[in-house]
Amino acid sequence: MYSSIGFAAQKVQISLSENVKKDLALTTDTESLDEVIIEANNERLNVRSSQMSANTLSTTTIKKIPVVLGEVDVIKAITLLPGVTSAGEGASGFNVRGGAADQNLILLDEATLYNSSHLFGFFSVFNPDAIKDLTLYKGGIPARYGGRVSSVLDIYQKDGNKREYHASGGIGLVASRLLLEGPIKKNVASFLVGGRSSYAHLFLPLFDNDNVAYFYDLNAKLSYNLNDNNRLFLSGYFGRDVFEISDSFANSFGNTTLNLRWNHLFSNKLFSNLSLIYSDYYYGLELKFVEFDFDSGIRNFNLKYDFTHYISNNIDLRYGINSIYYKFNPGDVTPTTEDSGINPFKLTDKYAWENAAYVDTEIELSDRISIHAGLRLSTFNRLGQDELFLYEDDNPIIYNESLDIYQKAKPIDTVSFGRSETIKSFANLEPRFAISYLLNEDSSLKASYNRMAQYIHLISNTTSPTPFDIYAPSGKYIEPQLADQVALGYFRNFKNYSFEVETFYKEVKNRLDYVDDADLIANDAVEQILLNGEARAYGLEVLFKKNTGKFQGWVAYTLSKSEQRTPGRTPTESGINNGEWYKSPWDKTHDISITGQYEFTNKWS
């Protein structure tokens, strides 16, 4: 007798004298029932787990959040969480616990995105229809993540439906989207493809406006089950923004990613994931009135091999390696006409190689105590380039004591390195630890510590990333940023509610600061305008959520302070602001967010 819930039973005669394997297709046998909604109880798991300072949002939750201009927005959704702020409308990126936007690691299917916004911050680069879920780590960051000192935003795309074809989309005031998914071979292979485009610029000529501003992006994913133990995924993203002001200038910028991923199941206790990843961020500017193009960007190739080992019911072990090769293009100028008057020139390309190995373990020591311990070893090699400037005493900035100002030092020589030669190397141990103590079935206390290293830097003297900014690697004159963070929290669940309160303290060493009148654009010696400083942030975060029922939502409150200082390098130097602490551009003492949704019927809310 073969039977399964929802299918009619079948009787089949078999011989007991020989080995037999039969695959049967059962016919459906359904009855109409009232709708039942099953939701994962993340709040209860959150009380028991040692993980803290992390928030997971499903696309269902994100789509329930009230929207502006008819567009569901992932980045605006996470800025409603405690500890997360935005520099404001029209500002790209987001800030976490007083950190800068470039200190956030943003991953889409494991590939790094260097700019998370369209139209200078009014929209995010994430198509909500293509997203499966996301997790934001503000602290207690697992050892499998590295490369940034503030946070990790880990986003995965849907795999595509392997049984049925589906289409979804939406039409907004300024943009529309469409997503298609379905089986290539039923129950074996599937596809997902989605696109978005804005069109508000099409109406500007009606108002005698020659300006142009629009974006478009494309998400795609292929999934293939080789067999019960092996799965392949190929996913990608391509996005572009275009902005033109009449006959003055035009610029375009955007991300490109590609990821080939292989999942392998060795046994029911050991799982692996091998990924080959490509990421690219491009910025192009055409200055029509002076007739030249300026292009810059950053590109990386990433190899990841991760293992998850379920040793016992109480012990999980994760370990793996990661290797990233970077190419930095600070910019090159190309005249667009013979009469331009601009000579072509190219800033020196830079190269680097970042490697890491990690181990993470989660252990339930008893019914009340759980720990999460990890260690990450990261290395960074600044590779060869043409014409590296040399300075007297290796000091690219000199201090004029009589004028009390910093000035550029004149290079005394240049030296060239081969592409595979190492100019300077760094290595850092990054320990991670978290512990949870269960007070009772509905409440717990948690504490965490993590150290993070960041080897690439956004060279920008604005409060938020802009397309004009460039990335630079650590090297002979630029030190990697190092952050230490501790947090303590109390977590409590009620019948339909959950409550979280956390306090944190974070210090960042080697935070870059800029001398007065720093020139960042088309600068082939940015070390002449940079000073090493430090930053700190501390605060209190509260999150109160209504998780079930017709009315759902949350209230988030953050009380925090974010400061930085750049002291003099010697007793005779004044530094910046006389070496005293001052508010960082991302300081926001009080921040409160309230979001809610009431469901009148299954179709109206």
Each language-model region and where it sits:
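A beta-strand signature from Gram-negative outer-membrane beta-barrel systems
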Residues: 22-24, 80-81, 125-168, 177-179
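Transmembrane beta-barrel wall of Gram-negative outer-membrane proteins
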Residues: 172-199, 208-242, 250-274, 278, ...
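Outer-membrane beta-barrel signature, preferentially recognizing the C-terminal barrel domain
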Residues: 79, 251-253, 257, 261-265, ...
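Extracytoplasmic beta-strand/coil segments of soluble accessory domains associated
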Residues: 66-115, 132
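Short, acidic, small-residue-rich periplasmic hinge/interaction motif at the N-terminus
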Residues: 3-8, 15-71, 75-76, 101, ...
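Gram-negative outer-membrane beta-barrel transporters
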Residues: 505-507, 526-605
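Surface-exposed extracellular loop regions of Gram-negative outer-membrane beta-barrel proteins
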Residues: 282, 327-339, 343, 381, ...
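Short acidic/polar hinge/loop motifs at secondary-structure boundaries
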Residues: 64-66, 111-138, 208-213
